[in-house]
Amino acid sequence: DIEMAKEGAKRMGKEIKLQPIDWDAKDMELEAGTIDCIWNGFTMNGREEDYTWTAPYMDNSQVVVTKADSGITTLEDLAGKIVEVQKESSAQSALEDKDHADLLASFKEFLMVDQYNTAFMDLESGAVDAIGIDIGVAKFQLQGKEEEFTILDEPISSEQYAVGFLKGNDELCDEVEKTLKEMEADGTFAKISDSYFGYDVSILGE
């Protein structure tokens, strides 16, 4: 996010100031004009009407990974299965959310490990049937293993990141979005993304 913001500001001919804030005070900061936008893995889902947003630039949905030959194709197929997540991860939070109470109750076992590397070893060995995980981490871990494992089409929860502005600040929002799309079109977004994630995380063109 920081590299993207720096590159975006440079292209727009603006000086950038990276301002850490108290997250609980973000709305006050925007309203007071002490910050112009929030560009920090800011989830737009559930907040669509609270801010003026750019188009979403990254998907951080929580998904399920299984072995390709497991026969598991939907979340309902996880009934009676052993599901593993990283302790204190977004996937754990999503599965423990009240919206997924029935899904969680259907598992044979719900296990937690300290690292996703351990979870993938457990999946590979057959110790567990599925892993709940961020889509970005899943795609990175599955590079070169696409025939062995699969990501279910149905996410546990959908989460997209966008740049958020004070409601009504359309002019600056539109300028930032235009610049983001230019960075996506000329490959800059992909280059920055690849240096951190090992692949292009952009969903701007979708």
Regions found by a protein language model. Give the residues of each.
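General small-molecule cofactor/ligand-binding pocket signal
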Residues: 17-19, 111, 152
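Acidic, polar ligand-binding/catalytic clefts
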Residues: 2, 6, 10, 15-77
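Periplasmic-binding protein-like
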Residues: 59-66, 135-139, 143-181, 197-206
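Ligand-binding cleft/hinge of the Venus flytrap
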Residues: 5-14, 91-112, 142-146
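A ligand-binding cleft/hinge motif common to bilobed small-molecule-binding domains
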Residues: 25, 41-50, 94-97, 122-158
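Alpha-to-beta junction loops
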Residues: 13-15, 31-40, 81-82, 115, ...
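Solvent-exposed loop/turn segments at secondary-structure junctions
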Residues: 24-25, 43-47, 70-71, 89-93, ...
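Extended ligand-binding regions for polar small-molecule ligands
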Residues: 2-11, 76, 81-82, 87-90, ...
